[in-house]
């Protein structure tokens, strides 16, 4: 099985700047469903956050993941901030949708999941 790394803010949930407000982050459902599908398929998932490795942030993030059923094998903090990070783009990536409710690309994960299913 493969190893996958997911960013937290902007990928699994709306961005959060204050741990006191972390519980208000909206989940990006398609991304969470895709991540959970990968876990259930036996893949190793790391969630890597730009959030600081501070006890308050760690606890708030773990609670949020538990609340929304986000499955993962490893949770990391202090990810460097980068404007763009591209790695192993999915086939037909130009055919993604846009989730207007949370302002994030979300339907891309459905296309990726379809591509992964065709590799079997």
Can you describe what each PLM-predicted range is?
Residues 1-120:
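HAD-like aspartate-dependent phosphatase fold
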């Amino acid at each position: 099985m493969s190893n996958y790394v997911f960013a937290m803010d902007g990928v699994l949930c709306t961005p959060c700047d204050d741990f006191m407000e972390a519980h208000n982050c909206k989940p990006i459902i398609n991304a969470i469903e895709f991540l959970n599908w990968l876990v259930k398929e036996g893949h190793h998932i790391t969630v890597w956050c730009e959030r600081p490795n501070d006890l308050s942030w760690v606890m708030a993030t773990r609670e949020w993941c538990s609340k929304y059923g986000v499955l993962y094998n490893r949770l990391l903090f202090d990810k460097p901030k980068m404007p763009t990070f591209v790695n192993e783009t999915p086939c037909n990536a130009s055919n993604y949708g846009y989730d207007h409710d949370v302002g994030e690309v979300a339907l891309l994960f459905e296309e990726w999941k379809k591509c992964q299913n065709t590799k079997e």
